[in-house]
């Protein structure tokens, strides 16, 4: 059985797990209003397997306009920039940024030979007083030219898009009474608990976010990363219609970014009000922050990212956060996890420190990401467990191209007693491929197991067992054998099956559209002979292979 807290027009439920293992359900207005006699309490669904149960629960939630304003991930557009590799200022600079640093790094990125297509300017640019926003223009000391100089570095075939970080409520603690907003915008604000907030009615809140988005769009930005969303509700708490007003903030941001054709990356937006009101946006953070060189935090980050995707992945692509390609602790693991997530992938190292070997396997020559058909989620045995303490391997998978399933096995254990764990891949794992999404059932097929690291292939007739020593991962592709052929894809890319499109396949002939350069791997069976053929691809093209 699956149960999830929900919001009403001006009510919010939540679950608390007690010390004795019992669970308490709460519901409140979180303010001065009385709770109505009837309010939504829980989203509940029972089913035969966890994937279909959660999917059906969210389908029911999408139909309930009192509790949510949602569309499924597959029904929404995905912002074009997020299909490409990006770079973010945060983990390298934190909030110590200025105009010259950003411009110098954009120049270094362009000279690096790595096709990074968007730059995201994170916290550190805002005009504020006591962590309250004073205006939607950057700090004049740090950015004396405003955004004009930085925008001049946009190029159609280089850094094409630039995004900007803001908080849903303006800044961390809301809006400052000492602000430079136009009078018409000030009239849409009211004081509460030491801050100015948009409100109190829906029209005023919408007018504030119309100004918010249009001001940043006029300055040249293509998308916004809107952070601190979950803390907007606490800023409203204790007043009248606290939940309704906080919900209107999310609704208005969604409506205005959509209307003004601005991309939206939701960040720290995991409370019910945030998650259940993504009517247009299609990317949300699913974990704590990534921190370079921090092994324990990296393990928790991976665990959270995949587990939370079981829920959030119903309505958005998961954002696994930025990463450092030069991270000697987990740079390669992070790169592969971003690949299988299907969400935005953006670096955060100093551009001079980029490690190309961890970056190029993610993308084609234009910086376009190779993405799965659906986000990676935990395999059944890895769902109701804590892989940091389980003493077992943690397995996640996603459907990738040409009928393949891409699977990563991790050792995320923190105890020294479990530095070595055993992982098993079984043939029946492949039958779960279409359980992750509502796809047509997978027929009984022969399956090829391809080890990405060793570049070895074998038919998976029963199971394959291997060891995971220390904080590590192993990447595999489970590919169907059809008419004596298996298309694995371009070896140099993490998501090899997503690098090739099958045009036609007969007993003796295979026609493919190969999407990037590299070494194409194809398994071929002819009479009693089996061959893993390597074909050099010097340019993306259509090719014909004969047995």
Q: Where in the sequence are the language-model features?
A:
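Active-site-proximal structural scaffolding
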Residues: 80, 102, 112, 143, ...
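Short helix/strand-capping turn motifs
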Residues: 85, 361, 369, 375-376, ...
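Glycan-recognition surfaces
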Residues: 172-217, 251-358, 374-385
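Aromatic-lined carbohydrate-binding/catalytic grooves of carbohydrate-active enzymes
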Residues: 80-243
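Flexible loop/turn segments at secondary-structure boundaries
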Residues: 93-97, 126-130, 169-175, 231-235, ...
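C-terminal beta-strand-rich structural cap/linker in extracellular carbohydrate-active enzymes
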Residues: 460-499, 520-522, 531-547
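Carbohydrate-binding surface patches
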Residues: 338-341, 346, 385-445, 475-482, ...
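Carbohydrate-recognition beta-sandwich/jelly-roll modules
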Residues: 1-118, 140-143, 161
């Amino acid at each position: 059985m699956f149960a999830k807290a929900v919001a009403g027009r001006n009510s919010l439920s939540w679950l608390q797990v007690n010390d004795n293992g019992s669970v308490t359900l709460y519901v409140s207005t979180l303010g001065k209003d009385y709770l109505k006699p009837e309010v939504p309490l829980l989203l509940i669904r029972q089913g035969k397997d966890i994937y279909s149960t959660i999917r059906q629960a969210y389908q029911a939630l999408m139909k309930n306009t009192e509790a949510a304003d949602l569309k499924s991930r597959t029904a929404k557009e995905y912002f074009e920039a997020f299909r490409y590799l990006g770079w973010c200022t945060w983990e390298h600079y934190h909030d110590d940024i200025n105009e010259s640093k950003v411009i110098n790094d954009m120049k270094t990125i362009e000279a690096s030979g790595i096709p990074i297509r968007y730059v995201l300017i994170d916290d550190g640019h805002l005009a504020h007083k006591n962590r309250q926003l004073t205006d939607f223009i950057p700090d004049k000391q740090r950015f004396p030219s405003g955004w004009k100089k930085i925008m001049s570095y946009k190029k159609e075939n280089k850094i094409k898009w630039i995004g900007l970080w803001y908080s849903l409520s303006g800044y961390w603690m809301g809006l400052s009474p000492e602000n430079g907003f136009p009078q018409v915008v000030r009239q849409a604000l009211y004081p509460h608990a030491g801050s100015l907030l948009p409100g109190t009615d829906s029209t005023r809140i919408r007018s504030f976010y119309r100004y918010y988005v249009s001001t940043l769009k006029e300055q040249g930005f293509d998308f916004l990363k809107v952070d601190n969303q979950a803390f907007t509700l606490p800023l409203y708490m204790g007043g009248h219609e606290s939940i309704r007003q906080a919900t209107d903030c999310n609704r208005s941001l969604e409506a205005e970014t959509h209307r003004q054709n601005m991309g939206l990356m939701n960040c720290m937006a995991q409370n019910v009000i945030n998650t259940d009101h993504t009517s247009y946006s299609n990317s949300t953070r699913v974990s704590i922050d990534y921190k370079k060189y921090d092994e324990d935090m990296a393990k928790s980050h991976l665990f959270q990212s995949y587990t939370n995707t079981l829920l959030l992945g119903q309505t958005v692509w998961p954002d696994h956060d930025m990463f450092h390609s030069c991270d000697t602790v987990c740079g390669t693991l992070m790169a592969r996890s971003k690949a299988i997530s299907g969400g935005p992938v953006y670096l955060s190292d100093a551009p001079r420190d980029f490690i190309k070997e961890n970056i190029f396997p993610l993308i084609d020559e234009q910086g376009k990401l190779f993405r799965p058909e659906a986000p990676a989620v935990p395999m059944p045995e890895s769902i109701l467990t804590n892989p940091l303490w389980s003493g077992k391997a943690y397995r996640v998978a996603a459907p990738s191209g040409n009928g393949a399933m891409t699977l990563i096995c991790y050792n995320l254990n923190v105890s020294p007693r479990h530095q070595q764990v055993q992982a098993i891949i079984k043939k029946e794992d492949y039958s779960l491929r279409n359980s992750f999404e509502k796809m047509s059932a997978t027929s009984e097929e022969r399956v090829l197991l391809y080890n990405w690291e060793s570049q070895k292939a074998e038919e998976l007739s029963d199971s394959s067992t291997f060891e995971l020593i220390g904080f590590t991962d192993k990447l595999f592709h489970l590919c169907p054998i059809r008419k004596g052929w298996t298309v694995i894809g371009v070896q140099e890319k993490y998501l090899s099956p997503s690098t090739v499109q099958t045009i036609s396949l007969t007993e003796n002939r295979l026609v493919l559209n190969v999407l990037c350069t590299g070494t194409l791997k194809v398994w071929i069976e002819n009479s009693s002979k089996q061959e893993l053929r390597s074909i050099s691809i010097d340019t993306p093209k259509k090719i014909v292979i004969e047995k």
